[in-house]
């Protein structure tokens, strides 16, 4: 929808939204807010950059806070994958400091370049938004493509100088926790993060069919996945219990504990096909056998 010729009276956000609502009654409330936001700023670089950065911070730390609360509650230890390694407040604070430093020094400059990248690759910011069904299948595709990128890039980071000088930073915590999802070397943040950002951008470049709001929903879900896979808990209601191909915290926690194998981000099949999960399955079998043996002795 082209609204560049519309005359808006007043500069307040609410006044702009109300006028646009009268001009475009066919738009839903969220679409009206979206349009009013861009009209209010009247600067797409600032509007998109600010929204992108705030979205990232709110989603990332907002998702981490529940896991911090869970870590502080002994009741949940029964589902902690490494129950003897609960992060201390000092560890979480130290992790938060480095994560915030990387957000403001590494990610913020990239985020402020996001609107020019959107324009270059052809992302739409107009209203109305695309149908929900289109968003769902595009985001599903991005999950599969990002998982492929992540597997191979992550596996590369476990070789020689790539691990010693870059990826070793992320492996500081052998028992990961939610906040540690983005505790990483700047080069790792850029290269692994490329799967999240540039996969959709390249899709848009070749298809000319992607909306910024779809991109935001995708990034939100990807942040949820990253934080949850580092949280260190495997609940009976975890997604991998209902979707067996989903990796989840159980899959990634072993990677941090053993410093090898299980290189995928969201799914399990790359590790299964290339047999980089064999040690993981052997470890789980030994742990299960030890559990049964302990229960048998207790029953006697």
UniProtKB/Swiss-Prot annotation:
The chain crosses the membrane at residues 186-206. Residues 140-276 form the Fatty acid hydroxylase domain. Its cofactor is Fe cation. GO terms for biological process: ergosterol biosynthetic process. Induction: Expression is highly up-regulated under low oxygen and low sterol conditions in a sre1- and scp1-dependent manner. The keyword Metal-binding does not apply. It holds the Pfam family FA_hydroxylase. Its EC number is 1.14.18.-. It is a single-pass membrane protein. It comes from the Eukaryota. Belongs to the sterol desaturase family. Heterotetramer of erg25, erg26, erg27 and erg28. Erg28 acts as a scaffold to tether erg27 and other 4,4-demethylation-related enzymes, forming a demethylation enzyme complex, in the endoplasmic reticulum. The histidine box domains may contain the active site and/or be involved in metal ion binding. This is C-4 methylsterol oxidase erg25.
